[in-house]
Amino acid sequence: QTVKTGFDHLEEFGVNAVQLLPVFDADNNEFEPTYNWGYNPKNFNVVDGVYSTNPKNGRTRINEFRELVAAFANNANNTRIIMDVVYNHTSTAMNSNFQALVPYYYFRTLPGGGLSNGSGCGNEFKTEAPMASKFIVESLVHWATRYKIKGFRFDLMGLVDIDTMAKAKQALYNIDPDIVIYGEGWGGYGATTLPGDKMTNSANLYANLHNEKTPG
């Protein structure tokens, strides 16, 4: 008997959801055969070239990833693709596009002027800043509409402010109420300047759920 592998094996096994490691553009050399986890994000709204047959061609990156998502969605199990998203930090703050756009606006800072590092990765994206919050929501909508992503797993979700998460949830459910949203319910590996009551962590999510279910 022929043993199916890869895509065919997942379909035969009845898998109805596949969570990918971060696939948006990371700070890596796309022409070197080295492994990268993808947790050093550089450009949040474009597919990383390492997954493309032609990294230099943006259209190829887009079309090939769309084909991947569609192939899973159209198989016997209607398998949904879930993206691991890393909006809590960037690969670098000082050399990022955000820093070039408006210096220090998009990153949390300490009273002494240094960068907050609750992520343990050198910086924290200031999700509570109005334009940063708007960027995250629109980025998620971008992936959900243009690539038909059906789920999002948030890395260090506790470092994303709860108001931004609420806006993101509403925006995604407006597109498709069946979209799956989940994440790591803690803040990271160090002190953060984001107030505790504003973190999308396990404690706050439980409290909000309890309040929603408690009358009066």
Protein language model regions, located:
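Catalytic domains of carbohydrate-active enzymes, especially glycoside hydrolases
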Residues: 3-32
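Conserved Walker B
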Residues: 85-90, 157
